[in-house]
Amino acid sequence: MKKTALLAALCSVVSLSSCCRIVDCCFEDPCAPIQCSPCESKKKDVDGGCNSCNGYVPACKPCGGDTHQDAKHGPQARGIPVDGKCRQ
């Protein structure tokens, strides 16, 4: 029983990490290639399966070595409010 529960938990973690989840829309990486935008991938995903964006993992970090302290990056670069709520 414990092995089954552990296996199920492990599979769910792996599947969550490999899918473009709708929650990623709040945290799109401004450096991401357009075709790997989590929101766009979710919209194009008609059959309900997972789209792993060819292994691309969204990340909130400055683009191209940008070191400006006041420059917006991560969610704020996409116009997402500081509180992290998704625009409807």
Swiss-Prot record:
It is a lipid-anchor. A lipid is attached at residue 19 (N-palmitoyl cysteine). One of its GO terms (biological process) is regulation of cell shape. The lineage of its organism: Bacteria, Pseudomonadati, Chlamydiota, Chlamydiia, Chlamydiales. PROSITE patterns: PROKAR_LIPOPROTEIN. It comes from the Bacteria. InterPro entries: Cys-rich_OMP3_Chlamydia (IPR003517). This is Small cysteine-rich outer membrane protein OmcA.
